[in-house]
Amino acid sequence: LHLSIRRQRQMCIRDRYYGFEYQQDLARGYDGYEDLLTTGYFETELKKGESIIFSASLDEMGSVKTIEEVFAASIARRTHKIDFISCLEHSARQFVIRRPGDRTEVVSGYPWHGVSGRQTFVSLPGITLEQGHKEDCIDALDTLVREMRDGMFTGNASAAVAADAPLWFFWTLQQLEREVGGKQIWKAYGPAMKDILESYRRGVGGRVALHDNGLVWAAADDVPMTWMNALIDGRPVTPRNGYQVEVNALWYNAVCYTLELAGKHGDKA
């Protein structure tokens, strides 16, 4: 952790505290013990009207000018929490995370949850498009699409094998189409849409199959295939093996939407 302050300073000696217990983490089955480092504190004098920029980062921030530029950009992005709606908008923005390597991800929930394809697709319209941040929506979708394998979303996205997650992708694109138009959707995401449908037609990892009746069958003993994804001793509490109603509703929507865009833009493949 890199700590810096924009002026001469004095930093007191660090120390370490041992054996912190987190009862909620233990109750949820997580490792609930941790040692914590205190970095001490900066000590300096301020005159009337002066300001100080303090930074904490995983990488070195660089020059004082760089820190000032980052600080100014951060201030410009902030929302003014003056009423209920602005507080909601501010909270929603905290779930959109930009990471190194041109990655934009959506955290499913603080403090325990990571990145989930399903939760990303379901939440993106509300936390980006409704606030006028379509570029964030596009960046998050592009991050997941770059890491697609065999029609499923992998990378850092948890629940990558769930049968419904890739199909929520189509629903999110339908919301994005209102902002950018169908032509751009098909140009940017048409190949991914066709890859997903083709993977379901072929079958995915012995867990997802398209049957002759046109319905999607999803079943597995070791991983949850739907949003009911609680595990006990490494096995799904509610497996729901078979024709899940929401999976097939999403499947029907995905097929219809893909055919609609393909027809409008002359793609017969």
Where do the protein language model's features map onto the residues?
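Extended glycan-interaction surfaces of carbohydrate-active proteins
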Residues: 16-24, 29, 52, 59-60, ...
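Short Pro-Gly-centered flexible turn/kink motifs
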Residues: 42-60
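Single conserved hydrophobic/aromatic residue that forms the stacking wall/gate
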Residues: 2-5, 9, 13
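Aromatic-rich carbohydrate-recognition surfaces in CAZymes
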Residues: 118-120, 124-226, 244-248, 252
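Short acidic, Pro/Gly- and aromatic-enriched capping/linker segments at domain boundaries
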Residues: 26-45
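Active-site neighborhood of glycoside hydrolase catalytic domains
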Residues: 248-269
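Exposed beta-sheet edge/beta-hairpin loop segments within beta-rich domains
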Residues: 40-48, 238, 242-243
